């Protein structure tokens, strides 16, 4: 192999093929040459990919896909290894690009899986409404219930009458107590009279623990829908409290049921004696729905196959030589490379179910809130079903014909006419404001950092903060993200900026992947998983016999993704692989074409060479909690073929250790930015300085700001260096436009759509600004904390998503920033830029920008090797994070198959490392 020098030797990075003129008809060749200036065929007719038109003689030649079954399996606690023997016959070429692993197994998503918002059970019930219940107080039984079924007869022995038997001369039919009276049956007209009638209903005994009706479920125990546990249904009879005659007017069929709350939990529970399951106080319990938690395989099955982990990789080796062509480096990021490559090839917003390809996303209206208030100019009313006001009974009268202008009773008119006086009774609700407030609480409030939440009183949550039960049970004071917070501004709540926005139930990609598996906890799955490793992903495998094996993870936190990022190991998820097969295609070529291709590729000048799409050395540097400076050093080396830096920031909690087969400290299952590209901490960088040795000034002093230093954002901008109404510097904006789109100092314009990809700068750049009270200039400012702020008092719960309390009273927060009485304010600016990796390009042009030597040469050219020192200044974060830096180099593999069953690989990566599989 050629020795790397100042410029990459592209002469050995190609696949040579027959020129079209060697095998196309002379007429077509002449046509191509004559029309080449305006109708270029390029290499459209390269020999290796020409389809067969003759010599296809056997059924095997025409069989497109072959199924390989493993010759060896190894199923362990943490992984599943499958080994295949690939036998490629004469005059065949196996297309590794078409191969995929076909995996069948069983997935248990665990009890934390909840693929919807809200509840499936009694979702229309008020959150604090109880079920029909009984309890004992002072040795007496109390009942709180509704009796909806109306009849004309109640007997002590048979209960309430539900009909007559026409076959037996109108004999009365009484309720079958196992399911009648049914709770869903009552008067079907609003004007049904309840005077002088008998009524019946069902109620839960005091031995069934009280729960709110919202979210309550009890399984049926008979085909009629009855729910009694044991058919021990007791009839309890009641009469009006002021009726001395003691006649049965109401009967309740009381029972014990298997009462559950499958998808809700309590957010308010009154204080009761320990062990109490039914009491008058418990009627006031309040339920809330469990938080949505979609669980699915990751985008493009990230994490399922082992990459970047020594000892857990795979093998592709010729059986004649046993040389493994798979040589991975610890600092190569195959998964991220595949994500970015797919984005460059197509539209990632289009889902492709075959590879589980549905990219992680978030609702931009949740990340950056445009709080433009609510359009509630007209009031919204609700009316009683009768559409009248308060009704009183009136009798009919008529003028007294006896004269004198008097009145007398009208015996032709009823003595009980139901008449309301004045306007129709109505209640008002501000639908728009309630919908907006509910949106903010469900989408922002519930995702606030845990230190801004609290555990409701009398509710016991587990100590492990990574469990679903803990995350689900914590509640937020709605005032932190209410309709009036930042009203009129386009601003992201500051406390949410460093919270992973992709771990959200509005992550449409995760929701799609979860629904692909279905809506149940237990899933027998059948998936197709592609090979992503760049050296063998697109390989043409020539005739011979090869060993191909790979490891598949079984760690649920790595292979599954959840909305909340809870620890799926603790929360009961599991996966089992029952069968892994390999499907692969032979090129459908004529035999003589295939043999020509084979002969061509056996020639060592026609080796197959592949670039890793990312082409970078990946390095992670720890940033301790609350640290603001990160120095890194690279020892002296030749920087030829170096292309620049990309960098971002990751949370340690969200980054697994890929060097080990199983990371016991990875107790998280949300998105893994390191692997899937869901970066979101770019806004936390302040500046970066770059020094080649101490003597080299790079990139020179002809930029806006200090040499050797790239200022990303500045909070105080006296000179006016910031851009776009935010705190990003013009310098950094230009560098990003230059490195992503080649739009540099020649001006500002929007990049073409084909360049502005999902992971690029311009699409994800979100500048924003707002005004806040100037606490120094506004003399009447008082720092009123959340617990003492009131706005909508009397109409909302106090510091929680609970029943409204309080009285109507003037609000004391926030200070007005508009109108005649606007207070003094200051402007705050910031930006977000998710999914992107900041880039600093390094090229021959940039090398020339350094200080010149006496000989007129740049120091970087004059010396063959230089050490690199970089210092990153970042915003402090209260948890450990990682600086993720890509050193963009050339990462190339050259595959050589000189003989049958022999495969050799040479890896070239300059200027960082090289390796080979030939020795």
UniProtKB/Swiss-Prot annotation:
One of its GO terms (molecular function) is structural molecule activity. The modification Phosphotyrosine is found at residue 907. The keyword Magnesium does not apply. The keyword Protein biosynthesis does not apply. Pfam families: Adeno_hexon, Adeno_hexon_C. Its main location: virion. Gene3D superfamilies: Adenovirus Type 2 Hexon, domain 4, Hexon Major Viral Coat Protein, domain 2, Hexon Major Viral Coat Protein, domain 3. Induction: Expressed in the late phase of the viral replicative cycle. SUPFAM superfamilies: Group II dsDNA viruses VP. The record marks 744 as: Involved in interaction with pre-protein VI. All late proteins expressed from the major late promoter are produced by alternative splicing and alternative polyadenylation of the same gene giving rise to non-overlapping ORFs. A leader sequence is present in the N-terminus of all these mRNAs and is recognized by the viral shutoff protein to provide expression although conventional translation via ribosome scanning from the cap has been shut off in the host cell. HAMAP family: ADV_CAPSH (MF_04051). Belongs to the adenoviridae hexon protein family. This is Hexon protein. The lineage of its organism: Viruses, Varidnaviria, Bamfordvirae, Preplasmiviricota, Tectiliviricetes. The gene is L3.
